[in-house]
Amino acid sequence: MGEIRLVNIGFGNIVSANRIVAIVSPESAPIKRIISEARERGTLIDATYGRRTRAVVITDSDHVVLSAVQPETVAHRLTARDASLAAAEEEEGEE
């Protein structure tokens, strides 16, 4: 199946990076609608610890995760992890 990769979405909360479809801002009406529908379906995960929602993580399992960190920060953590994995794989290949 492949290696499980994880990304920190703030306050020690971690999401499977392999399952992330989108990381978006919660400001637009369509995203607010997605949040509301997920709440009704029981697939909303609030990981904000009572703080303001700054990022909405949408997964391939239709779960919607609310995060208190900026979407850019989550994306940076995700891409930084990918870059470090690629560098480690290159080093292994050189040995």
Curated annotation (Swiss-Prot):
It holds the Pfam family RemA-like. It comes from the Bacteria. HAMAP family: RemA. Belongs to the RemA family. NCBIfam families: MtxBflmRegRemA, PRK04323.1. This is Putative regulatory protein STH1338. It comes from Symbiobacterium thermophilum (strain DSM 24528 / JCM 14929 / IAM 14863 / T).
